[in-house]
Design a protein with these regions (language model features):
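Short low-complexity stretches enriched in small and charged residues
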Residues: 32-33, 42
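Glycine-rich, flexible loop/turn motifs
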Residues: 1, 9, 18, 41-44, ...
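A short, surface-exposed loop/turn module that caps and links secondary-structure elements
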Residues: 40-64
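Conserved phosphate-interacting/catalytic interface
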Residues: 36
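Arg/Lys-rich, positively charged N-terminal/basic patches that mediate binding to nucleic acids
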Residues: 1-32
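Enriched for short, Lys/Arg-rich terminal
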Residues: 54-57, 63-91
């Protein structure tokens, strides 16, 4: 379950509103948001290799990411649900 969003654009997309900067991959991003929202545990996300759920390090330590495509990631913190969810190009 998604508890909070760090990125207003990600929240807008989650509510099925058009976000220009996500044009071209909005369907894939929305699918990942739905998967994240439905996940009962972090382990459930990691159970599907296609999600490529991984713990981050460095200045993003404590966060996890799911790949949307080669460039964009769905980043979040996990504490009994997803929090501070954002869609970022952190490369």
């Amino acid at each position: 379950m998604i508890k909070s969003f760090k990125c207003k654009a990600a929240e807008k997309l989650y509510h099925r509103k058009f976000v220009r900067k996500f044009a071209g991959f909005e369907r894939a991003a929305l699918k990942r948001l739905e998967i994240l929202d439905a996940a009962p545990t972090l382990g459930a996300l990691a159970a599907f290799p296609g999600n490529r759920c991984e713990a981050l390090s460095g200045d993003r330590k404590g966060q996890y990411s799911i790949r949307i495509n080669k460039q964009w990631r769905l980043c979040f913190e996990w504490n009994e649900g997803a929090a501070e969810v954002e869609i970022v190009d952190y490369h």
